[in-house]
Regions:
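Intrinsic low-complexity/IDR segments
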Residues: 1-4, 9-84
């Protein structure tokens, strides 16, 4: 499905396979319903960012266990803690 311009606010994406897709980062995608698979995938992508901010690194390290449950973590590589 072509979701360009779609308002995903409060959308239920539980069970959706969003591999190789683009997640919109605008207000219309806030408050969606997701299952653990998608939440881990989004957390993994968040944790894979190269950001040197101390607050980001603290947050990142605190959710690594969850993020590394991403269904493709074996293929993409387990993320390790970073020092501040």
């Amino acid at each position: 499905a072509d979701l360009r311009g779609a308002n995903l606010r409060r959308a239920d994406l539980s069970g959706a396979n969003l591999d190789y897709s683009c997640y919109p980062l605008w207000c219309g995608s806030l408050h969606l319903k997701a299952d653990k698979r998608l939440a881990c995938q989004l957390a993994y992508h968040l944790c894979s960012m190269q950001c040197d901010d101390a607050d980001y690194i603290k947050m990142r390290n605190s959710i690594l266990g969850f993020a590394n449950q991403f269904h493709r973590a074996d293929e993409c590589g387990e993320l390790k803690e970073r020092e501040i």
